[in-house]
Each structure stands twice: as structure tokens, then as C-alpha cells.
């Protein structure tokens, strides 16, 4: 009887031990998971880490070169740290940044770049908003086809697309030939090697960057708000300015930044379509780097441009945080 009574006790103690070990293992995993990033954090953090590394490291290198002096050698700039007689000396040159503020050419170039980028952004908005609105209000099947047409230019090399505009805009190109044949003009329009050609090239190249964020906001808009406005007697223009436009405000800001920021430093379009008097900061940086071999001056121009572009980005970030705070 003692043997039969003691027989069930072994499985019970073994099961209890396994249960205790399982709880302990889950407890250790739960404690460890507190220090590990979640799946969402990893999905968002890895691309940000990638961009930070491949943006921050080159920027730090350019920033370092901007404080050096130009020399004829490889590399064509001096070292910032020198050791003489066991003493470390730092040779930081601020003359390049001072020259940016004193030279009229650089100031005019920055202002011209900002103006051309701003005008191109406004033109992209005026053209892209009706396009995005029409696509968002189309049938789903047609909507997919239209968005595919918007993204279709990205399947072709950017350089080839800009080169194609040379054949369209030059004096004996397709556009002037068509306008003269229709009797609209009698002499060719000077579009190639001019600021007008640069505007056309930038609007064409950056228009999809305006359309896509606008479409993303317009397609999610609640159409019952417009129906309620019409039921209350609002005219279409009033409903658009009071409902549609405010609800698409974030799309306008995002699209404008996606166009404005790369347009400021654009080099290929003004180099191929612009004239000799077309002042863009990208062309100045190229000349300083490769023609003058003045890497410190070119780096200072680059750093100043990046700092200049941080202002609208910081304002946009502040606005987004404020919007989220008001929503809560």
C-alpha cells in the first residue's frame, strides 16, 4: 500500500518542476524583451539608421574639409590637426564662410537658387493639385492606371529625360517647330539655354513628387463632409476652400518640401537646359570642386546650403509635432 500511494507523487513533482521552469523562462524572456526594440521600432529604425549613417558621415567629412585650406596636392586640402614638438595644434579656417557672406556672387547664387526652387515649387503645386484631385476622385481601376502614368517617368534615367528636353526646347526643336507650323509664333522662342528651360525641366522632373503626397491625402478625405456642405447650400468653390484645401494642407506641405529641397541644389537641369547666366548653387559647387579644385570653398558652400535647407525642414517638423499635439 505504501508503494502504490507513493507512485503518483513522482509525476506530480516532475510536472510542477516543468511548470516552474516554464514560468521562469517566460519571466526571463519578458524581462529581456523590455530592453529589446519592438518590431515596429526595428522596421522604422533600420532605414533611419541607414540614412543617418550614409548622410551623417559624408556631411561630417565635408564639414571637416570646409575648415581646411586649399593646397596643390592629394588630397587638395590641409589637415586640421598638426602635431609639432609633441604639442597638438588645431588649424581651423573660418575664412571660407566669411567669404561667402562678403562675395556678391555667392549671395546672388543662393538667392537665385532659392527663387528658382520656390517658383518651380509653386508651378508644381498649381499643376499637381488638379492632377492629384482628379486622380483621387476617379474610379479605382482608372485611379491605378493614372498613378502608374505619374510614376512612369521614374522607369527612365533622369539624365536621359533631361536630355530629351533639349530636342524639344531648342530653337529648331519640336515645340518651336510645332508652334511655327500652327502660325502661333513666327520666330522661335528662346527656351533652350535660358531660365525658362530650367523651370520647364524642374517642373517636369519634380512634378510626381508633388502629386503623390497630395493624392495620398486627397484619396483618404471623407466625402460626406462635402455632401453636408452642399446640402447646407455651399457652392463648390466655398466647399473647396473651406473643406478640401484645409484637409489637404499636410499633403501640400509635404509635396512642397519634396520639390523645394532637391530643387535648390539641382545641378543637371541648369547645366543642360540653362544658360551661362543661370545661377544655381549646384553649378557653383561643381565648378569649385572640379574646375578650381578648391575643395574647402566648395565644402563651405555645401555646408551653408545644408544649413539653409534645415530651416524649412525644422519648421515642417515643428508644425507636424504641433498638429499631433492639437489632435490629442
Annotate each predicted stretch with a short phrase:
Residues 5, 15, 23, 27, ...:
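C-terminal transmembrane helix and the adjacent membrane-cytosol boundary/short C-terminal tail
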Residues 23-67, 134, 144, 148-150:
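N-terminal signal-anchor/first transmembrane alpha helix
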Residues 27, 31-35, 118-151, 224-226, ...:
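Transmembrane-helix boundary motif in ABC transporter permease subunits
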Residues 29-33, 80, 84-85, 162-203, ...:
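Membrane-interfacial helix termini and adjacent extracytoplasmic/periplasmic loops
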Residues 34-40, 83, 97-100, 104, ...:
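Interhelical loop and adjacent transmembrane-helix boundary motif
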Residues 43-44, 131-165, 226-227, 240-241, ...:
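Cytoplasmic-entry segments and transmembrane alpha-helices of multi-pass inner-membrane transporters
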Residues 46-47, 148, 152, 204, ...:
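Transmembrane alpha-helices
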Residues 56-104, 172, 275, 328:
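Short membrane-interfacial helix/loop motifs at transmembrane-helix boundaries
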Amino acid at each position: 500500500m505504501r508503494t502504490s500511494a507513493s507512485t503518483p507523487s513522482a509525476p506530480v513533482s516532475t510536472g510542477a518542476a516543468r511548470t516552474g521552469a516554464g514560468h521562469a523562462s517566460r519571466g526571463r524572456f519578458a524581462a529581456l524583451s523590455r530592453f529589446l526594440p519592438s518590431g515596429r521600432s526595428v522596421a522604422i529604425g533600420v532605414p533611419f539608421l541607414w540614412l543617418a549613417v550614409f548622410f551623417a558621415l559624408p556631411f561630417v567629412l565635408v564639414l571637416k574639409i570646409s575648415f581646411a585650406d586649399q593646397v596643390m596636392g592629394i588630397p587638395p586640402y590641409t589637415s586640421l590637426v598638426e602635431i609639432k614638438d609633441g604639442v597638438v595644434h588645431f588649424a581651423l579656417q573660418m575664412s571660407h564662410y566669411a567669404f561667402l557672406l562678403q562675395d556678391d556672387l555667392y549671395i546672388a547664387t543662393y538667392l537665385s537658387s532659392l527663387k528658382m526652387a520656390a517658383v518651380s515649387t509653386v508651378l508644381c503645386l498649381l499643376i499637381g493639385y488638379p492632377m492629384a484631385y482628379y486622380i483621387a476622385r476617379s474610379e479605382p481601376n482608372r485611379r491605378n492606371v493614372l498613378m502608374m502614368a505619374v510614376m512612369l517617368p521614374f522607369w527612365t534615367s533622369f539624365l536621359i529625360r533631361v536630355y530629351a528636353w533639349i530636342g524639344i526646347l531648342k530653337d529648331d526643336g519640336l515645340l518651336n517647330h510645332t508652334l511655327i507650323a500652327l502660325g502661333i509664333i513666327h520666330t522661335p522662342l528662346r527656351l533652350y539655354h535660358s531660365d525658362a528651360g530650367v523651370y520647364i525641366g524642374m517642373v517636369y522632373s519634380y512634378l510626381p513628387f508633388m502629386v503623390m503626397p497630395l493624392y495620398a491625402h486627397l484619396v483618404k478625405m471623407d466625402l460626406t463632409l462635402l455632401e453636408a456642405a452642399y446640402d447646407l447650400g455651399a457652392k463648390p468653390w466655398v466647399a473647396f476652400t473651406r473643406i478640401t484645401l484645409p484637409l489637404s494642407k499636410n499633403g501640400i506641405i509635404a509635396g512642397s518640401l519634396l520639390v523645394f529641397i532637391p530643387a535648390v541644389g539641382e545641378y543637371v537641369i541648369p547645366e543642360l537646359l540653362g544658360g551661362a547666366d543661370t545661377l544655381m548653387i549646384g553649378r557653383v559647387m561643381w565648378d569649385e570642386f572640379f574646375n578650381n579644385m578648391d575643395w574647402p570653398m566648395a565644402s563651405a558652400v555645401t555646408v551653408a546650403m545644408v544649413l539653409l535647407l534645415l530651416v524649412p525642414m525644422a519648421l515642417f517638423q515643428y508644425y507636424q509635432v504641433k498638429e499631433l499635439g492639437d489632435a490629442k
